[in-house]
From Swiss-Prot:
<feature type="transmembrane region" description="Helical">
    <location>
        <begin position="184"/>
        <end position="204"/>
    </location>
</feature>
<keyword id="KW-1133">Transmembrane helix</keyword>
<keyword id="KW-0472">Membrane</keyword>
<dbReference type="Pfam" id="PF00146">
    <property type="entry name" value="NADHdh"/>
</dbReference>
<feature type="transmembrane region" description="Helical">
    <location>
        <begin position="268"/>
        <end position="288"/>
    </location>
</feature>
<keyword id="KW-0520">NAD</keyword>
<keyword id="KW-1003">Cell membrane</keyword>
<keyword id="KW-0874">Quinone</keyword>
<comment type="subunit">
    <text>NDH-1 is composed of 14 different subunits. Subunits NuoA, H, J, K, L, M, N constitute the membrane sector of the complex.</text>
</comment>
<dbReference type="GO" id="GO:0009060">
    <property type="term" value="P:aerobic respiration"/>
</dbReference>
<feature type="transmembrane region" description="Helical">
    <location>
        <begin position="152"/>
        <end position="172"/>
    </location>
</feature>
<dbReference type="GO" id="GO:0003954">
    <property type="term" value="F:NADH dehydrogenase activity"/>
</dbReference>
<comment type="similarity">
    <text>Belongs to the complex I subunit 1 family.</text>
</comment>
<protein>
    <recommendedName>
        <fullName>NADH-quinone oxidoreductase subunit H 1</fullName>
        <ecNumber>7.1.1.-</ecNumber>
    </recommendedName>
</protein>
<dbReference type="InterPro" id="IPR018086">
    <property type="entry name" value="NADH_UbQ_OxRdtase_su1_CS"/>
</dbReference>
<comment type="function">
    <text>NDH-1 shuttles electrons from NADH, via FMN and iron-sulfur (Fe-S) centers, to quinones in the respiratory chain. The immediate electron acceptor for the enzyme in this species is believed to be ubiquinone. Couples the redox reaction to proton translocation (for every two electrons transferred, four hydrogen ions are translocated across the cytoplasmic membrane), and thus conserves the redox energy in a proton gradient. This subunit may bind ubiquinone.</text>
</comment>
<feature type="transmembrane region" description="Helical">
    <location>
        <begin position="303"/>
        <end position="323"/>
    </location>
</feature>
């Protein structure tokens, strides 16, 4: 019993180290990818100077960021100001614990995996609010308040769309949800829920056209206006890591997880299929960011409360009724 417990602890520690390393490398790659996507959309090549096709540009920028001075303004709440970037980044990492990268490639296959991810995502918003308030800056505080309002508005339809999938599988365990999509992905059975999830996930990650909390033309840099160096870098790491998490969840819920299309894997390992789908969804979010203009805050709120929430609620009710009729037959 003791030997098994020790092995489990070693497995957990190794998994946490891998998660931490992957999250850093993944964020570096996504920054480079976004620069390239933005460049292509704007008819330019993007960064090309450092490394082949600019691959090392992000690494050099990271080294430069680490060397930047950590400035703490006199008027801030010092302890909360320093703690906020860490509090933003840490809850995002929890999502990696329950993500099903492949058959058996789940660090913790919990029966409340979905609930865990969305519960901890709330802490990120609280950390953003703490950082905005502690900065003692009107732009930072206004950006943080906008972030809270946006999160509340879009968390509701996001959870309603997820519940539509949970009803179909009768489980919150990611492995069971992915296993149920061995032949047909849920995006074909729940197209409305899948589309709503992607819209809400884009808003949850504060990406354009929903980047109201960081609107440069209005709020300088939003809630991280006063941050410099790696404190500023942690906010960016959290943003890109969170973008990976929400798209990985979309892959698990709607796009078959580690399964290939219609049950055919074409000889590729499950983890490869999982990453391909996740990065394709990330590309779509980046494409939307660099294609559509930012909407106003009142438009953002109206879109959620008057359209997304009613539609997602109707979709959930229809799903429940259809499943009940199937059971009766």
């Amino acid at each position: 019993m003791g030997h098994e417990g020790g092995t489990e602890w070693v497995r957990l520690i190794v998994g946490l180290v891998i998660i931490l390393a992957f999250s850093q490398l993944n964020a570096l790659f996504l920054v480079w990818l976004e620069r390239k996507v933005a460049g292509r959309i704007q008819l330019r090549p993007g960064p090309m100077e450092v490394g082949p096709h600019g691959l090392l540009q992000t690494i050099m920028d990271g080294i430069k960021l680490v060397g930047k001075e950590l400035i703490t303004p006199r008027s801030v709440d010092r302890k909360l100001f320093i703690l906020a970037p860490v509090l933003v980044f840490m809850p995002v990492l929890v999502g990696f614990l329950v993500l099903p990268f492949g058959p058996g490639l789940i660090l913790r296959d919990m029966n409340v995996g979905i609930l865990l991810i969305f519960s901890f995502s709330t802490f990120t918003v609280l950390a953003i609010l703490a950082g905005g308030w502690a900065s003692n800056n009107k732009y930072a505080l206004l950006g943080a308040i906008r972030s809270v309002g946006q999160n509340v508005a879009y968390e509701i339809p996001l959870l309603l769309t997820v519940m539509s999938v949970v009803l179909m599988v009768n489980s919150m365990r990611f492995s069971e949800i992915v296993a149920a999509q061995g032949r047909v992905w849920f995006i074909f059975l729940q197209p409305v829920a899948g589309l709503l999830y992607l819209i809400c996930a884009t808003a949850e990650t504060n990406r354009a056209p929903f980047d109201i909390p960081e609107a440069e033309s209005e709020l300088v840099a939003g809630f991280h206006t006063e941050y410099t160096g790696m404190r500023f870098g942690l906010f960016f790491l959290a943003e890109y890591t969170n973008m990976f998490i929400v798209t990985a969840v979309a892959t698990s819920l709607f796009f078959g997880g580690w399964h290939g299309p219609f049950g055919f894997d074409f000889g590729l390992p499950g983890v490869v299929w999982f990453l391909i789908k996740t990065y394709v969804l990330i590309f779509v979010i980046m494409w939307v960011r660099w294609t559509f203009p930012r909407i106003r805050f009142d438009q953002l709120m109206n879109f959620s409360w008057k359209f997304l929430i009613p539609v997602s609620l109707v979709n959930l009710v229809v799903t429940a009724v259809v499943l009940k009729l199937i059971d009766l037959n």
